[in-house]
UniProtKB/Swiss-Prot annotation:
GO molecular function: glycine dehydrogenase (decarboxylating) activity
EC number: 1.4.4.2
Naturally occurring in which organism (per UniProt): Staphylococcus aureus (strain MRSA252)
Enzyme class: oxidoreductase
Domain of life: Bacteria
Pfam families: GDC-P (PF02347)
Keywords: Oxidoreductase
Record GO biological process: glycine decarboxylation via glycine cleavage system; nucleoside metabolic process
NCBIfam families to which the protein is assigned, alphabetical: PRK00451.1
Record's protein name: Probable glycine dehydrogenase (decarboxylating) subunit 1
Subunit structure: The glycine cleavage system is composed of four proteins: P, T, L and H. In this organism, the P 'protein' is a heterodimer of two subunits.
Catalytic activities: N(6)-[(R)-lipoyl]-L-lysyl-[glycine-cleavage complex H protein] + glycine + H(+) = N(6)-[(R)-S(8)-aminomethyldihydrolipoyl]-L-lysyl-[glycine-cleavage complex H protein] + CO2
Biological role stated in the UniProt entry: The glycine cleavage system catalyzes the degradation of glycine. The P protein binds the alpha-amino group of glycine through its pyridoxal phosphate cofactor; CO(2) is released and the remaining methylamine moiety is then transferred to the lipoamide cofactor of the H protein.
Similarity section: Belongs to the GcvP family. N-terminal subunit subfamily.
Length: 451
């Protein structure tokens, strides 16, 4: 047998023989001599023979065609992942090799372009949220939320956090996971009054032991919480105010910082990040100058070199685990730099007016859909909303959604998964991409299936 090396394929037969000869072994099997023979797999793995690239691509495309996607179906599914317009320039820019990484650079002095891009992301987040400082991004909005709660515990030295059940249920799950590692932490969940937080119960729960109060804006059920009223409950208790906010909605709604929020977190998925099997996403974390030194994740700052030229650096690194290890503000130092860049490009391409216009379209399209459902005889739950709302059906939502797929429609989220109180309730998302005809068809088919 002729044994040859291959320029691009590692570990050829020739490579194996040379390695075995070097270490004095006769075969690869000899390397596993210490492993009992009865647990060794004494046969080849059941792996198919290689195929030509064209044949393989055809097979993979056939497999992929089984998926239901927003390219083949009209989507009214949201619940944290939305079908929004992404300018074409986003993919063109993030595909540049200089940017194509999920990490902040380890040698920042030679990565000025990447650092400036992250700095611009931080600046855009601060403008949207009306906050002083933002980090370079986090894994997703839910991670950012949990980290915000940890910061509140650390800052206030108190052990209770009061959270609305209007928060995304998975964000609450992440928080409870974090809390399990800290026995002294207490998480108090406040019930809803319809689709918004029960303010009387919230006010009663906030006391001198409260580290923070957290709500979502707009909340998981699509309704807009009264941040001004909620903040009034917190002021004299010396607790922090955490707001989990949809950044696109902030193009129109009054930002949380204007209501006295101490920490604003969320997910920038609505800006330039596609709905790709639920991820990856990009969490943002914004706060006040007072809390700057306790921010998790990495911070990029602007500075000057010895010659007076503008430059960018990773700043305040003493907070991070590679410096302080167990005393770090957070054990997260990785982030979503590539997705943060995508969101930055999308926001920059749209501009302030463009973001505002898209936010307005979301409200208008959602309100139109609401009215059509009401005209069709559905019960639509009350609440001022952005681009999501709740509709009650007479039949199980899973059954309705399975039938809607036959009409190339992806229905809304089954809220019965979250709570028995919302059995047969569908959370419907209507973004700027949904047309009048698509909405009308959805309502018509939903009505037929509900009869």
């Amino acid at each position: 047998m002729c044994i040859v090396s291959h320029r691009y394929i590692p570990l050829t037969e020739k490579d194996k023989q040379e390695m075995l000869q070097t270490i004095g072994a006769k075969s690869i099997g000899e390397l596993f001599g210490d492993v009992p023979s009865d647990i060794l797999l004494n046969r080849d793995l059941n792996i198919a023979e290689s195929e030509a690239e064209t044949t393989l691509l055809r097979r993979l495309n056939r497999i992929a065609s089984k998926n239901i996607t927003k390219e083949t179906h009209t989507s009214f599914l949201g619940a944290g992942v939305y079908d929004h317009y992404a300018p074409s320039v986003v993919d063109a820019m993030i595909s540049r090799s200089e940017f194509y990484t999920a990490y902040t650079p380890y040698q920042p002095e030679i990565s000025q372009g990447e650092l400036q891009a992250i700095f611009e992301f931080q600046t855009l987040i601060c403008e949207l949220t009306d906050m002083d400082v933002a980090n370079s991004s986090m894994y997703d909005g839910m991670t950012s939320f949990a980290e915000a709660c940890i910061l509140a515990f650390s800052q206030t030295k108190k052990n209770k956090i009061v959270v609305s059940k209007g928060l995304h249920y998975q964000a609450l799950q992440v928080l409870h996971t974090y809390a399990k590692t800290r026995k002294e932490f207490e998480v108090v969940e406040i019930d809803l009054d319809g689709t918004v937080t029960d303010l009387k119960k919230l006010e009663a729960a906030v006391d001198d032991d409260t580290a923070a109060v957290a709500v979502q804006y707009p909340n998981f059920y699509g309704s807009i919480e009264d941040l001004e009223k909620i903040h009034s409950f917190i002021e004299d208790k010396k607790a922090l105010f955490i707001v989990y906010a949809n950044p696109l909605a902030l193009g129109l709604l009054t930002p949380p910082g204007s209501f006295g929020a101490d920490i604003v977190v969320g997910d920038t998925q609505p800006f330039g990040i596609p709905a790709q099997f639920g991820g990856p996403h990009c969490g943002y974390f914004a706060t006040t100058k007072k809390l700057m030194r306790k921010v998790p994740g990495r911070l990029v700052g602007q500075t000057q070199d010895d010659e007076g030229n503008r430059g960018f650096v990773l700043t305040l690194q003493a907070r991070e685990q590679h410096i302080r290890r167990d005393k770090a503000t957070s054990n997260i130092c990785s982030n979503q730099a590539l997705n943060a860049l995508a969101s930055s490009i999308a926001m920059s391409a749209l501009g302030k007016q463009g973001i505002y216009d898209i936010a307005v379209q979301n409200i208008e399209h959602a309100n139109y859909a609401k009215q059509q459902f009401i005209k069709k005889g559905f019960e639509v739950l009350d609440g001022t909303s952005f681009n999501e709302f709740v509709v009650k059906f007479d039949k199980p939502i899973q059954q309705v959604n399975e039938e809607l797929v036959k009409y190339n429609i992806i229905g809304g989220f089954d809220l019965g998964v979250v709570s028995d109180d919302f059995k047969n309730h569908m959370l419907i998302a209507v973004t700027e991409l949904r047309t009048k005809d698509e909405i009308d068809t959805f309502v018509e088919k939903a009505g037929e299936l509900n009869d």
